[in-house]
């Protein structure tokens, strides 16, 4: 599925702003600069096991690295690689239906991204007048993921098991979902100068994806008998673990397992240390 038109338009506008700023910067006293850094933090997701609760989950550590190309004191381009680790359990939910479903997953998402940044005020590492600024960012990323679930202390990759009947003859079963995809990262942050060569960044960003399978839960229960016969007992065990069954039915085939058609999203919260990798500014600063 292609991104919504308004998301694409917003991204194009940002790129045009960056391009125009490069022309302006060539006429000023500002020299372009390059910085790089590393980030640590955590993340959360919005999906079947956490439908609408921001900043909820069993937070796991994440990390990454990046390089930033500052076109002037307002605009920059950042290329980054980041690992976000998610861990969720239905049993943590206050929703009785979700808690009764009793599923869980973990997912290590590796993401490569390119984003455009806009500083709220003029900012540059090494400029004593540029102590602090807020900033916005948006761009495009490519990510890979593989949800897993645990039985008796062993974690199993879920996509090959087809827990909703993917790749089997069960009713309404489709193909196995992709484990790579594109996302639109967007968010905001704050930059704090530490001296001539370094800075701290604090950032929150959402990733709008086009997959409903970060958690391996999307549509309807497959036939447990078909899963066991065609995909194996492990697929059947990890597909269904409800505490109480609707209508006392042993096989829930066709019953709702997730929210079909609602894509998952994930967010990243991080603190990063940034340092300048070209020469320290020595010219007089613009006032």
Regions found by a protein language model. Give the residues of each.
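Gram-negative (and chloroplast) outer-membrane scaffold detector with strong preference
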Residues: 75, 80-160
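Residues on the lipid-exposed face of transmembrane beta-strands in outer-membrane beta-barrel proteins
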Residues: 38-42, 65-69, 114-120, 138-140, ...
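Outer-membrane beta-barrel transmembrane domain signature
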Residues: 141-263
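Repeated loop/turn-to-beta-strand initiation elements of outer-membrane beta-barrel proteins
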Residues: 74-77, 124, 196-200, 279-283
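Residues that define the transmembrane beta-barrel architecture of outer-membrane proteins
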Residues: 32, 57-61, 108-112, 132, ...
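Short glycine/proline- and aromatic-enriched beta-strand/turn motifs that initiate or cap beta-hairpins
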Residues: 26-70, 147, 265-270, 274-280
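Outer-membrane beta-barrel proteins
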Residues: 45-51, 87-92, 125, 145-150, ...
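Extracellular loop and loop/strand-boundary signature of outer-membrane beta-barrel proteins
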Residues: 46-54, 97-105, 123, 169-176, ...
């Amino acid at each position: 599925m292609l991104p919504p038109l308004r998301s694409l338009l917003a991204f194009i506008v940002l790129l045009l702003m960056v391009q125009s700023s490069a022309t302006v910067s060539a006429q000023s006293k500002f020299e372009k600069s390059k910085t790089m850094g590393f980030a640590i933090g955590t993340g959360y997701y919005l999906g079947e096991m956490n439908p609408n609760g921001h900043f909820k989950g069993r937070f796991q550590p994440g990390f990454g690295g990046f390089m930033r190309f500052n076109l002037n004191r307002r605009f920059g381009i950042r290329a980054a690689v980041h690992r976000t680790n998610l861990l969720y359990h239905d049993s943590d939910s206050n929703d009785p239906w979700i808690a009764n479903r009793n599923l869980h997953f973990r997912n290590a998402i590796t993401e490569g991204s390119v984003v455009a940044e806009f500083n709220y005020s003029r900012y540059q590492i090494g400029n004593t007048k540029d102590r602090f600024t807020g900033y916005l960012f948006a761009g495009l990323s490519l990510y890979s993921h593989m949800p897993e679930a645990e039985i008796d202390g062993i974690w199993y990759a879920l996509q090959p098991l087809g827990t909703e009947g993917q790749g089997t003859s069960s009713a309404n079963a489709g193909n196995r979902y992709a484990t790579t995809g594109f996302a639109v990262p967007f968010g905001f942050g704050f930059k704090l100068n530490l001296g001539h060569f370094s800075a701290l960044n604090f950032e929150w960003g959402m990733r709008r994806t086009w997959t409903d399978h970060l958690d391996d839960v999307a549509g309807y229960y497959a036939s447990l008998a078909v899963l066991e016969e065609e995909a194996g007992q492990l697929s059947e065990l990890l597909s269904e673990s409800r505490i109480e069954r609707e209508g006392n039915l042993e096989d829930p085939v066709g019953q709702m397992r997730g929210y079909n058609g609602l894509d998952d999203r994930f967010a990243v919260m991080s603190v990063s240390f940034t340092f300048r990798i070209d020469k320290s500014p020595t010219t007089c600063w613009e006032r």
